[in-house]
């Protein structure tokens, strides 16, 4: 496949390495220094663009790629609140393709399946209270992360006593300051606490606590390699699939 990269930071470099190892060609690399190249012949020749940028840039990047009929794989988060319906319409009515996921790691896809299954079980045991904690790297812009929100929404969909998620305490270990999070948290809210610590790719944990015991499931990333491989697998998936896609389309479990 001919692949364009939108965003050439640490993730972009890792995606490039894995894509080349799997026999693909990188035809264009777009970063903050050359945003105009998204209109270049090289970009337009791509079968798919893999986009990892930020919440403010992502939607505009999708529109640019779609205008050139280039499919998009994206791991950017934080844009869905304002633009989800627009993207759904573009993929349905405009026949465009976006494979979006808050996390492309195969391990997180498996963790997500376990999370959904456990939530269905715990729906019948109201003596257990559920909460979440995530520990991404200190540079992560959104708190909670898109991955944490996706996991929380899966729990809410399967546990009747939870109606919404709320941001709990966010703590930065580097300088010790913290943010108390959302006000007016009730028993119907699933609290997501965040710890910003170091340079690690991320830890996500779901805890079910009762007077008798605690059940915890956790995913810990050792590197960005798992995310990058998943993004390339998603790009390969778009060769024969179109529309609005996500990891549940790619991983059938």
Where are these regions (language model features)?
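Hydrophobic beta-strand scaffold residues
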Residues: 26, 72-73, 97-98
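Rossmann-fold dehydrogenase core element
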Residues: 86-105, 122-132
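C-terminal substrate-binding/catalytic lobe of Rossmann-fold NAD(P)-dependent oxidoreductases
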Residues: 2, 10-43, 124-253
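Rossmann-fold NAD(P) dinucleotide-binding segment
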Residues: 41-42, 46, 52-75, 85-86
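Rossmann-fold NAD(P)-binding glycine/threonine-rich loop
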Residues: 76-98, 109, 114-117
């Amino acid at each position: 496949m001919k692949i364009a990269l939108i965003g050439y930071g640490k993730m972009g470099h890792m995606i490039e390495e894995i894509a080349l190892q799997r026999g693909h060609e990188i035809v264009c690399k777009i970063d903050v220094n050359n945003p105009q190249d998204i209109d270049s012949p090289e970009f337009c020749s791509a079968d798919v663009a893999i986009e990892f940028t930020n919440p403010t840039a992502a939607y505009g990047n999708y529109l640019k790629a779609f205008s050139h009929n280039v499919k998009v794989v994206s791991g950017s988060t934080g844009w869905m609140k304002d633009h989800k319906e627009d993207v759904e319409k573009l993929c349905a009515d405009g026949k465009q393709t976006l494979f979006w996921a808050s996390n492309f790691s195969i391990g997180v896809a498996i963790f997500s399946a376990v999370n959904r299954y456990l939530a269905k079980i715990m729906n019948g045991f109201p003596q257990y209270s559920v909460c979440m904690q995530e520990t991404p790297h200190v540079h992560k812009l959104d708190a909670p992360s898109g991955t944490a929100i996706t996991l929380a929404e899966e729990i809410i969909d399967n546990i009747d006593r939870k109606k919404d998620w709320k941001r709990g305490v966010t703590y930065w270990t580097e300088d010790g300051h913290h943010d108390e999070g959302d006000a007016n948290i009730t028993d119907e809210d699933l609290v997501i606490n965040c710890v910003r610590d170091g340079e690690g790719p991320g830890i996500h944990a779901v805890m079910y606590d009762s007077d008798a015991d605690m059940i915890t499931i956790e995913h810990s990333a050792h590197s960005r390699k798992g995310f990058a491989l998943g993004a390339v697998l998603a790009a390969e998936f778009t060769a024969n699939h179109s529309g609005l896609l996500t990891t549940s389309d790619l991983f059938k479990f």
